Amino acid sequence: MSYELDPLPYEYDALEPHISEQVLTWHHDTHHQGYVNGWNAAEETLAENREAGEFGSSAGALRNVTHNGSGHILHDLFWQNMSPEGGDEPEGALAERIAEDFGSYEAWKGEFEAAAGAAGGWALLVYDSFSNQLRNVVVDKHDQGALWGSHPILALDVWEHSYYHDYGPARGDFVSAFFEVVDWDEPAARYEQAVELFE
């Protein structure tokens, strides 16, 4: 099996002025494509090693599967949870659960923004299937700090390639801009999926 890069669910300039066409083009076509290529290359190495019975390079390939596979999956989520029609707050069951698990939307958002400021990769809202609750997590790179058994609901990429061209070192401005394009329909669907699977 090989993995492919899906097109963005909107035009490259659709999120302007919050995220520029140039950043989306670089981010999707170069960075995200690189994770897809890296995942495919690592899988090829593993398949060749299994066939040959030689496993000297398998440990490195396994790490590359984790890093690049997680990068591909998280980027897919990132693109899907934004749209030019975004910018509202969540509604319905997800909004109620955020209020239940965090106290309020404002408390969740403040904690999520803190995660985004600290992360060396991603801030994620996840459904923790062990505790049956929503949590914010700080993920470095694509795979360090993830919580086992968690189901991602909302993903924010805070690698520098996501914002530096548009915002320079002002990551907080980029995080604020992200909330102007968040489309809660996809996270709400992912939350409903998690509840069906785990509750």
From Swiss-Prot:
E.C. code: 1.15.1.1
Keywords: Manganese, Metal-binding, Oxidoreductase
InterPro entries: Fe/Mn_Superoxide_Dismutase (IPR050265), Mn/Fe_SOD (IPR001189), Mn/Fe_SOD_BS (IPR019833), Mn/Fe_SOD_C (IPR019832), Mn/Fe_SOD_N (IPR019831), Mn/Fe_SOD_N_sf (IPR036324), SOD_C_sf (IPR036314), Superox_dis_Halo (IPR054865)
UniProt-recorded name of the protein: Superoxide dismutase [Mn] 2
SUPFAM superfamilies: Fe,Mn superoxide dismutase (SOD), C-terminal domain, Fe,Mn superoxide dismutase (SOD), N-terminal domain
Enzyme class: oxidoreductase
A GO MF term: metal ion binding
Pfam family, one: Sod_Fe_N
Family membership: Belongs to the iron/manganese superoxide dismutase family.
Keyword DNA-binding: no
Cofactor: Mn(2+)
Cofactor binding remark: Binds 1 Mn(2+) ion per subunit.
